C-alpha cells in the first residue's frame, strides 16, 4: 500500500516536470505577443494645421485648413492633440454674406467653422517664430497647454500647411517667409529631441514640392500639391461669397478622406493617387526616401486617425459566470434596491408648498435718525423758500 502511494506520487511529480517546459514556453509566447503588440509603431497621433494667409481673397486657405481639421477630428484625433493656426478670421469678416460660417463647397451644406472649432493661434499670432517654437518645443513656460505640441518619440505627427509660396519659401501673412532650409532644420531639431516617431508633411501652395527638397531627417514622408515652377490652382468658385472656396489639391484629398473610417485599411499609396494632373491641373508630388516603411504598409489612420490599441479576434470565448459571483452580485443589487426604496426625494420635497406659499410680510420698524434728519432738512428748505403764507395752498 505504501509502495503504491509512493509510486503514484512519483508519477505525478514526473508528469509535472515534463509539462513544466511546455507551460513556460506557452507563457513566454504570450508575453512575446503582448510585448510586440504594445511595441508596434506609435502610441499617439498629433496634428499641426497651419493657414498662413490673410485677407478676404484668401478665403480658400482658411477653408482648406478647417476642412482638414474637421477630417482629423472625425477620425478620432481630439482637440487636445491638434494645434490649429489660422492667420485670419473669415467667419467674422464684414464681407462674409453668411456671418459666423466658413464653407468648403458651393452647395453651402457643410459649415466647417462649427461650434466646436478650437483655434489655438489666430490672427497676428500666426508667425514664423511661433510656428517654429511649436514644432521644436522652445516656448515660454507660461504658454497654455492648448498651444503646445506635447509629442514624444512614440508620436506620429501630421503637419498640414496652406498659403502662398514660391521656390523654396512659404509666405506668412504677406509680411514674412519661412524657407525650406528653416523648415528642414526645425524637423531635425524635432528628431534630435525625440519629438516624433514618424512625420507626414502635406503642403498645398504654389511650387510646394520645393519645400521638402531640403529635408534630411529620418522617418519623414512629404506630399505637395505642385512641382517646382507650377502653380497650385483654386477650386469651387462661389458668386455669393465672391471668391473660390477651396484649393484643388485639398479638395480632392478631403473628398478621399470622407470615405475613410477609423477601421479603414486604406494606405498611403492610395493617397498619392487622389489628385492626378487631370483634376489638379498642377502635378502633385511626394517624397518617401526618408521614410523607413513602405508606403503601401502605412495606413491613412496612422496619421489622420486616433491610435486604438484593439486587436480583433475570431476566437470563441466562454463567458459562463461563476454561480457564486452571480449570487453575490444578486444579493448586492438587492441590498442596494432596499436602501434606495425609501429615498424617493421627489415625493419627500414639499414642492407645491414652496412654490405657492405667500411671501412673508416684513415687520415695521420706525425710521432711523438719518431718515428723520433728511425729512427735517427738506421741511426747513421748504419754509425758507416759500414761507408760512404758502401753506394754505398746500392744505
From Swiss-Prot:
Primary location group: endoplasmic reticulum
Subcellular location: Endoplasmic reticulum membrane
Segments in the Cytoplasmic topological domain: 386-395
Cross-referenced InterPro entries: GPI_transamidase (IPR028361), Peptidase_C13 (IPR001096)
Top-level EC class: transferase
GO molecular function: GPI-anchor transamidase activity
Disulfide bridges in this chain: 275-280
Record bears the keyword Endoplasmic reticulum: yes
UniProt note on regulation of activity: In the absence of proproteins substrates, exists in an inactive state with a disrupted catalytic site by an autoinhibitory loop. The binding of proprotein substrates, particularly the CSP region, to GPI-T triggers concerted conformational changes that alleviate the inhibition by the autoinhibitory loop. Meanwhile, proprotein residues near the omega- site induce the formation of a catalytic cleft for catalysis, following which the products are released and GPI-T reverts to the inactive state.
Function as written in the Swiss-Prot or TrEMBL entry: Catalytic subunit of the glycosylphosphatidylinositol-anchor (GPI-anchor) transamidase (GPI-T) complex that catalyzes the formation of the linkage between a proprotein and a GPI-anchor and participates in GPI anchored protein biosynthesis. Recognizes diverse proproteins at a C-terminal signal peptide (CSP) region that lacks consensus sequence and replaces it with a GPI-anchor via a transamidation reaction. Transamidation catalysis reaction follows a two-phase mechanism.
Protein name (database record): GPI-anchor transamidase
Biological source species: Bos taurus
Encoding gene (name): PIGK
Amino acid at each position: 500500500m505504501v509502495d503504491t502511494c509512493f509510486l503514484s506520487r512519483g508519477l505525478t511529480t514526473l508528469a509535472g516536470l515534463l509539462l513544466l517546459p511546455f507551460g513556460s514556453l506557452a507563457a513566454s509566447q504570450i508575453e512575446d505577443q503582448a510585448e510586440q503588440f504594445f511595441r508596434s509603431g506609435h502610441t499617439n497621433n498629433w496634428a499641426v494645421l497651419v493657414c498662413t494667409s490673410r485677407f478676404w481673397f484668401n478665403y480658400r486657405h482658411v477653408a482648406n485648413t478647417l476642412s482638414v481639421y474637421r477630417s482629423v477630428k472625425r477620425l478620432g484625433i481630439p482637440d487636445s492633440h491638434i494645434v490649429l493656426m489660422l492667420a485670419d478670421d473669415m467667419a467674422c469678416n464684414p464681407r462674409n454674406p453668411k456671418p459666423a460660417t466658413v464653407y468648403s463647397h458651393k452647395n453651402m451644406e457643410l459649415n466647417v467653422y462649427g461650434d466646436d472649432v478650437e483655434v489655438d493661434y489666430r490672427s497676428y499670432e500666426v508667425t514664423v517664430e511661433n510656428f517654429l517654437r511649436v514644432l521644436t518645443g522652445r516656448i515660454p513656460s507660461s504658454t497654455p497647454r492648448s498651444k503646445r505640441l506635447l509629442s514624444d518619440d512614440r508620436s506620429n505627427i501630421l503637419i498640414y500647411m496652406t498659403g502662398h509660396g514660391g521656390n523654396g519659401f512659404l509666405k506668412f501673412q504677406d509680411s514674412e517667409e519661412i524657407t525650406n532650409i528653416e523648415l528642414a532644420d526645425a524637423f531635425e531639431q524635432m528628431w534630435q529631441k525625440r519629438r516624433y516617431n514618424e512625420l507626414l508633411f502635406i503642403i498645398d501652395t504654389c511650387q510646394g514640392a520645393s519645400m521638402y527638397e531640403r529635408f534630411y531627417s529620418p522617418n519623414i514622408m512629404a506630399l505637395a500639391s505642385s512641382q517646382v515652377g507650377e502653380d497650385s490652382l483654386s477650386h469651387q468658385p462661389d458668386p455669393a461669397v465672391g471668391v473660390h472656396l477651396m484649393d484643388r489639391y485639398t479638395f480632392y484629398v478631403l473628398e478621399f478622406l470622407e470615405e475613410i473610417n477609423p477601421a479603414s485599411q486604406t494606405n498611403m499609396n492610395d493617397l498619392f493617387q487622389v489628385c492626378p494632373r487631370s483634376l489638379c491641373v498642377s502635378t502633385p508630388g511626394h517624397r518617401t526616401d526618408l521614410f523607413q516603411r513602405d508606403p503601401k504598409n502605412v495606413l491613412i489612420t496612422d496619421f489622420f486617425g486616433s491610435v486604438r490599441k484593439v486587436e480583433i479576434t475570431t476566437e470563441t470565448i466562454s463567458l459562463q459566470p461563476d454561480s457564486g459571483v452571480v449570487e453575490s452580485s444578486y444579493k448586492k443589487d438587492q441590498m442596494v434596491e432596499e436602501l434606495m426604496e425609501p429615498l424617493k426625494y421627489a415625493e419627500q420635497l414639499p414642492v407645491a408648498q414652496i412654490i405657492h406659499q405667500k411671501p412673508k410680510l416684513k415687520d415695521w420698524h420706525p425710521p432711523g435718525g438719518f431718515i428723520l434728519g433728511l425729512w427735517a432738512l427738506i421741511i426747513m428748505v421748504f419754509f425758507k423758500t416759500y414761507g408760512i403764507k404758502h401753506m394754505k395752498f398746500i392744505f
